[in-house]
Amino acid sequence: MEKSIKLVAFDMDGTVLDSKLRLPKGLFEMIESHPNVKFVVASGRQYYSLLNIFNPIKDKLIFISENGGIIMEKDKVIHIMPVPDAKALEVLDLVSEDKGIYPVLGCEKTSYICLLYTSPSPRDRSVS
C-alpha cells in the first residue's frame, strides 16, 4: 500500500522565510502542483499579514494565524478562539507598565495596534 502525504503545515518566521523574509523560490508552484495535499500556514502573525504574502494562492491554503486564535480557509472562519474581555484587560494592564510595548489586539477582520494605550488605568478603556 502506497502512503501519500495528505497535509503539510509550515511556520513562517524562522522556518519558511529566509533571513531576508523571502519565501523559497517555487513555493507557490509546488503548492499548486499538489492539489490533493492540504497546505497549512501556521503563524503567530495576523491573518491579513499572511494573506498579503500568499494572496495569489490563498484559496489553496488553510491559515492558522494569531498563534492559533483564528483559523481561516477560503476566506471563511473555520475556528476562532476569542480572548475574554477580562483576560484582555488583564494583559493590557500588565503591558501598560512598559512604555516600550505596544500591544496588538487581533480581531477577525482587523488588528489594532495600541499606540495610545497610555491612560493611568487601562480599565478606563473599552476592549470592544
Language-model features: locations:
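Asp-based phosphoryl-transfer active-site loop
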Residues: 6-19
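Conserved residues at the C-terminal ends of beta-strands
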Residues: 11, 66, 128
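Short, small/polar residue-rich loop motifs at catalytic or cofactor-binding pockets
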Residues: 2-4
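Basic side chains
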Residues: 6, 45, 123-125
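Single conserved hydrophobic/aromatic residue that forms the stacking wall/gate
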Residues: 117-128
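Active-site phosphate-binding/coordination module
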Residues: 23-116
